[in-house]
Design a protein with these regions (language model features):
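Helix-loop "lid/cap" segments that line or gate small-molecule binding pockets
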Residues: 41-44, 62
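Conserved beta-strand segments of alpha/beta enzyme cores
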Residues: 27, 64, 117-120
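Anion (oxyanion) recognition and catalysis
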Residues: 22, 59, 97
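Alpha-helix capping/helix-boundary segments
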Residues: 1, 34, 72, 92, ...
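Short, well-structured N-terminal submotif of metal-dependent ribonuclease cores
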Residues: 1-30, 43-56, 125
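Acidic, PIN/NYN-like endoribonuclease modules and their adjacent C-terminal/linker elements
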Residues: 93-125
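Amphipathic alpha-helical segments within well-ordered protein domains
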Residues: 2, 36-39, 77
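Active-site neighborhoods of divalent-metal-dependent phosphate/nucleic-acid chemistry enzymes
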Residues: 64-104
Length: 125
């Protein structure tokens, strides 16, 4: 999501996924924990007003924000305990597993979990 919002490498692939979701030919999901991660990064870098603007923009996109149930927390904790990933990334992995989803990312941290979840690598420039 940050690649898309900040015009980084991989933005076009994320844009295509969102266009496909708008047409109904695919689904884009995001764990609420990862939405929080995006918002804190935006607020830290650009301020609270910008974070609110980004939240409003994300809410207009064809993205289903997934709530976090207790079992998801337990699954994310297990992933974090056994893999060198951030806590927020553990939630992305757990949500992707639960929904049989593919993670779009350029974050090399996900190399260690490719046996757990399908990863589509965004091009890095």
């Amino acid at each position: 999501m940050l690649a898309y919002l900040q015009g980084e490498a991989g933005m076009l692939r994320v844009k295509k996924a969102l266009e496909d979701a708008k047409k109904g030919s695919s689904q884009v999901t995001m764990c609420v924990i990862n939405l929080g991660e995006v918002l804190y990064i935006i607020e830290r870098e650009r301020g609270l007003v910008k974070a609110h603007e980004v939240l409003a923009a994300i809410q207009q996109l064809p993205i289903e924000i997934l709530p976090v149930e207790n079992q998801t927390v337990f699954n994310a904790a297990h992933i974090k305990a056994n893999h060198a990933v951030s806590y927020a990334d553990a939630f992305a992995i757990a949500c992707a597993q639960e929904n049989r989803a593919t993670i779009l990312t350029g974050d090399k941290e996900f190399e260690t979990v490719e046996t757990l979840v399908k990863v589509e690598w965004l091009k890095q420039v």
